[in-house]
Amino acid sequence: MATEHIENKLKLLPDKPGCYLMKDVNGNVIYVGKSKNLKNRVRSYFKSKQVGRRAELVREIRDFDIITVSSDKESFLLEITLIKKYQPYYNVQLKQGTGYPYIEITNERDPQTRLTSIVHKDHGYYFGPYPNVYAAQATLKFIQKVWPLRRCTGHQGRPCLYYHMGQCLGACFKEVPKSTYDAQIRKIKRFLNGDIAQVKQDLTEKMTQASMDLEFERAAEIRDQLKYIEQTVEKQKIISNDHTQRDIFNFYVDKSWISIQIFFLRQAKLLRRETRLFPLTDTNDPQDAFVSFIAQFYGQRNRVLPKEVLVPAGMDNESLSEVLKVPVRTPQRGQKKALLEMAHDNAKLKLDEKFRLLELGNRKTKGAQKEIFDALGLPYGHRIESFDHSHIQGADPVSALVVFTDGEADKHEYRKYKLKGEVEHQNAADEVGNTREVVRRRYSRLLKEHKKMPDLILMDGGQIQVEACLDVLRNELNVNIPVAGMVKDDHHRTNHLIFGDPTKGEELKLIPLDPKSEGFYLMTRIQDEVHRFAITFHRRTHAKNALSSKLDEIKGIGPKSRNKLLRKFGSLKKIKEASVDELREAGLTLPQAQTVKLSL
């Protein structure tokens, strides 16, 4: 529901093209969009029911701004600028760069070949990126041996080591003609562009000769070199008739998700591909999200623009081309059209795969939780809360609460309780008293703060715990939450549930679950998790209390001094190991530090 402030602004929206900036309660821009008609588009966010990611966005909007322009093309260019400026949360968020290295031929008087992960526009020739870093390093070493350029810092007045090894042309002590560099660079570029037939033939002959000469280590080195060349230079089969560097983008949309597939063609070969999947914020215009993605994609660090970008029909190619500064085309027939369709098919395949994996995951989460509710005869609920207690012969009693939402642990909602002990139940080991106390504290607070109650409470225990929990909920708090107990067998293994409501005259009954069902597995996960959480909390509490008790026995050490030591050292062992000076650094006086040292 829109606020009065937003409703008033909606009435003033113009029927013009432009961009809109959605803002949260802190005034931060959380989404940037564009439209041919700002009035219709912005109003649609607040005047119709939203689902998915768009619903999440609308819930956070507290204000918006608009910027009008004279054409849809201008709104597209402005949108890209605003997204780059504000990096809004609900716009497509791209990861920074691939991190893969390039082989660079530097643009210098005395050029060199090197591996780099940073691309400087117009600073040289770049080849890659190469996903196999080790193969790229080996290929670079091969280039430096076969077609050397400069390998040293240059101009040092004497030949460098690499010159003596034949891996440097000698810029270190003489002027190397530019024509010599140019000839070497042409050979390197041909090699990195895929002209490797002669190189492979020469290496194969050398490998064969080394084997015949029983130089097996040398033969193995050459074999590995051939493999690295194939991984970096010859990696893919030829799939096109021309050698234009081009990137191919296509997409597929389903269930408010978009899958984008990118093919990188270099020297008529498919060098690599990338897939991006993300939920759509504006499901009405997936084309806008697609085009915005492409524009942001090349704004990333180390992204090298190709000579041509191919996109499917229906895109604003002219505006996108203006942003990218390279031709953006839509092929109508032939190999390019086939590659575009292949990118679409791969995008669909990836999104279908994601949904299948989500479905399998749901069987173990939502599906498993539904099995538990069905077994208890309850309508499906999203939230389960579970309690367990821990103590050592009544000492340092604690309780722990874990929360599972739609079958998954929601650790941000976990809670820990140090039990104080009821008046009528002074024995801290008493399960009834512990259960009553923690249930009362938990749900009286939820009532006071008007927070949502769980759909089911699972007690780690049997009839005693369930009846104590129900007594507090029904008779003290007047809360009607279903409660079941997770019962273990004689071997301390999860066995079944116990369910009913004696406060309403219902008998507690054993509810079996199929041990091979997902619902049974979820029940054991909940029981194991709440037990783990309670035990871990108790160990820490007991250790801390034991340390405090030990320090309390030392004459002259009061609560303030004790807390200083606990903050500084954290454990009795570290306090014992500390010197008098270190104890004084914690804030103790010299007599106190000496007393602690002697007492421990």
From Swiss-Prot:
Function per UniProt: The UvrABC repair system catalyzes the recognition and processing of DNA lesions. UvrC both incises the 5' and 3' sides of the lesion. The N-terminal half is responsible for the 3' incision and the C-terminal half is responsible for the 5' incision.
Mind telling me which SMART domains this protein's record contains? Answer: GIYc
Q: Which UniProt keywords apply?
A: Cytoplasm, DNA damage, DNA excision, DNA repair, Excision nuclease, SOS response
Chief location category: cytoplasm
Its cellular-component GO annotations read: cytoplasm; excinuclease repair complex
Subunit-level organization: Interacts with UvrB in an incision complex.
Question: Which residues does the UniProt record annotate as the domain GIY-YIG?
Answer: 15-92
Q: Name one GO molecular function term.
A: excinuclease ABC activity
Q: Which family does it belong to?
A: Belongs to the UvrC family.
Q: Which InterPro entries match?
A: GIY-YIG_endonuc, GIY-YIG_endonuc_sf, GIY-YIG_UvrC_Cho, RuvA_2-like, UVR_dom, UVR_dom_sf, UvrABC_protein_C, UvrC
Q: Reply yes or no: does the keyword Cytoplasm apply.
A: yes
Put simply, this protein is called UvrABC system protein C
HAMAP family per UniProt: UvrC
Q: What organism, scientifically named, is this protein from?
A: Lactobacillus johnsonii (strain CNCM I-12250 / La1 / NCC 533)
Q: Which CDD domains match?
A: GIY-YIG_UvrC_Cho (cd10434)
Q: A Gene Ontology biological process annotation? A: SOS response
Q: Which Gene3D superfamilies match?
A: 5' to 3' exonuclease, C-terminal subdomain (1.10.150.20), GIY-YIG endonuclease (3.40.1440.10), UVR domain (4.10.860.10), UvrC, RNAse H endonuclease domain (3.30.420.340)
**Where in or outside the cell?**
Cytoplasm
UVR domain location, by residue? 197-232
